Regions:
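Alpha-helical transmembrane segments
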Residues: 32, 313-326
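Solvent-exposed, non-transmembrane regions of membrane-associated and secreted proteins
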Residues: 6, 11-305, 324
Length: 328
């Protein structure tokens, strides 16, 4: 009788142990699946940081190679000009070309995936042409040429048939990015930008600073809204709107600092003034839409944190559920 009882007790403990192991495996599996977006975020951020650092090193290396060597680009053999300088000249020439052509090939910007220059001849195989830094949004992204899905998954992209971000006038570099991608914010917090805020774009030769001059919400097919504006050197940021949808486009127009037209400067000063009394109906509607987007972003963040708290509590219950209780 005693042996039979011990045997049953042993079997019960064994079954209990197997159940505990199964629950732990299921729990860890569920935790891993839930954490995948955050793990992807860590991996992608590391890759972005690596790409950004590599680009900076390449630019610094090129600048050091040509330091002390003054070359007259109008008379020297093009083979004697550093590759970055050649690329920069080709970018400027391309900007002049599309302005002269009236950007005739520009339709729905999201469909423009092609690289407008052959970057491989300059030793650029990944299509990265710069670094976009937006302090107000706390994001630094690699900038790629061509809006392919693969490149948009890695950072910001310059749309085809728009200008390169280099010095000059009559140019508008349209930069697009996802409204958040696999945990990386990208342009998720684009509504933080206000008129007067600044951002920088580092190209293969220099770092240019741009100031926000206007913000607008447009339809996807309103390509005329992102065309070159004569006399201005611009960067235009664009992403889907509203948050989690893509029925419209949220557009932020920026002018290179020092080249802003008088109207844009006046707009920035007006936005900074606490005495602003007139708010148009369209601006009121835009503000309400932005507040709704911000609520959705905050809700998603809160639910994500709450999910981890819930998973933690389940883990505690599993542990306490299988701790042997002392018999009185």
């Amino acid at each position: 009788m005693q042996k039979s009882r011990k045997k049953k007790e042993k079997k019960k403990q064994k079954n209990r142990m197997l159940m505990a192991i199964m629950l732990i495996i299921l729990y860890l599996g569920g935790l891993f699946v839930y954490a995948i977006p955050d793990l992807q975020k860590i991996v992608l951020q590391k890759e972005n940081e690596k790409a950004v650092e590599h680009f900076k090193e390449e630019v610094e290396g090129s600048q050091q190679d040509k330091s002390g060597e003054e070359t007259d680009s109008t008379s020297a053999d093009s083979n004697q000009i550093p590759k970055n300088a050649q690329l920069y000249q080709e970018m400027q020439a391309y900007n002049q070309q599309i302005f002269s052509d009236g950007q005739s090939g520009l339709t729905d910007p999201w469909s423009y995936e092609q690289e407008t220059l052959d970057l491989s001849q300059y030793g650029i195989d990944d299509g990265m042409i710069g670094i976009l830094d937006i302090p107000k949004m706390d994001v630094t992204l690699p900038l790629y040429l061509g809006a392919t899905q693969e490149k948009m998954a890695k950072g910001a992209v310059m749309l085809g048939q728009t200008s390169f971000p280099v010095q000059g006038t009559d140019s508008n570099c349209v930069i697009a990015a996802h409204r958040g991608w696999k945990g990386i914010p990208m342009f998720r917090e684009i509504e933080r930008l206000e008129i007067g805020d600044e951002l920088t774009v580092q190209n293969c030769q220099e770092t240019l600073t741009y100031r926000v001059s206007e913000i607008e919400i447009i339809l996807p097919d309103e390509s005329d809204k992102i065309m070159i504006q004569p006399g201005r050197n611009m960067v235009t940021l664009m992403t889907c709107h509203p948050y989690t949808q893509n029925s419209r486009r949220y557009v932020v127009y920026c002018d290179e600092v020092g080249t802003q037209p008088e109207a844009a400067v006046d707009a920035a000063e007006e936005a900074d003034s606490s005495q602003q009394e007139i708010i148009t109906t369209s601006e009121q509607n835009r503000t309400e839409a932005l507040e709704e987007d911000q609520r959705l972003i905050e809700r998603d963040t809160l639910w994500r944190k709450a999910g981890y708290v819930g998973i933690g509590l389940i883990g505690v219950l599993i542990i306490f559920g299988f701790i042997p209780r002392k018999k009185h």
